[in-house]
Regions:
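Low-complexity, intrinsically disordered P/S/T-rich segments
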Residues: 1-166
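P-loop NTPase catalytic phosphate-binding loop
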Residues: 17-18, 108-113, 117, 136-227
């Protein structure tokens, strides 16, 4: 059955009568799981080993953990190699991999290894539908669950907004600020009854949040002065 978004909610109405949004409202993307092929992995490993070797940095092992958008290359440096020396080679490694940008995690917390995060040549889409349809989101006991994406190991990444006293979202144009805010709002709309949640959305440009005008009667707190 369809969800009538313009019908006001009675504060005394039982929660059981409310129809939550259905997942078929969200676009579904096929996930074949093949984020990066073996050939690309081997080529990147060899380039990393070559660049480090050119600067006198020897490593014991290198392994790859493939995620939807990035691959983590985990290296174990040889004895006596300074971590700072590897971190200083970040630009050289990025150049050899022809990557837009890499991130070096030195060391990886809880491990005696150094991580090099490299963007996949072809990033897979992590859809909101796949996250909200996950067992982790469906069965969460968080008070205000927000699903923000997936980790490098392809696990759904969620946090409880109720446990975050302040949240600042910042970044350059096109880096996904609006996408992140939409993910937060969508997560809450799919989990909370209108009697549990009220939103105050301030959108000076009247563009980013205009799509939420349809839920005014249910989730929007009244603001007397538009200015």
């Amino acid at each position: 059955s369809t969800v009538e978004l313009n019908t006001p909610i009675n504060p005394k109405e039982p929660f059981t009568r409310y129809k939550y949004p259905t997942l078929n409202l969200l676009k579904k993307y096929e996930d074949n799981g093949a984020y990066i092929d073996e050939e690309e992995q081997i080529a990147n490993k060899n380039r990393i080993i070559e660049v480090l070797g050119n600067f006198g940095v020897q490593i014991k092992t290198i392994r790859a953990t493939v995620g939807p958008t990035i691959t983590l290359y985990e290296i174990q440096p040889a004895e006596g190699v300074r971590i700072s020396k590897i971190k200083n080679l970040e630009d050289d490694i990025a150049l050899s991999l022809a990557a837009l940008g890499i991130r070096i995690i030195a060391p990886i917390p809880g491990k005696g290894t150094i991580g090099i995060e490299v963007p996949n040549a072809k990033a897979n889409i992590v859809s909101m539908e796949s996250i909200l349809n996950s067992k982790k989101f469906q069965e969460t006991k968080m008070e205000l669950p927000i699903a923000l994406g997936k980790t490098i190991t392809n696990e759904v990444f969620m946090v409880d907004l109720a446990k975050i006293p302040h949240l600042l979202v910042a970044g350059a144009t096109g880096q996904g600020k609006s996408v992140g805010l939409n993910a937060i709002i969508t997560s809450l709309l799919y989990k909370k009854h209108p009697n549990e949640l009220k939103l105050v959305l301030i959108d000076p440009k009247k563009v980013e949040f205009s799509v939420y005008s349809r839920i005014t009667n249910k989730f929007m707190a009244a603001v007397p002065d538009e200015e």
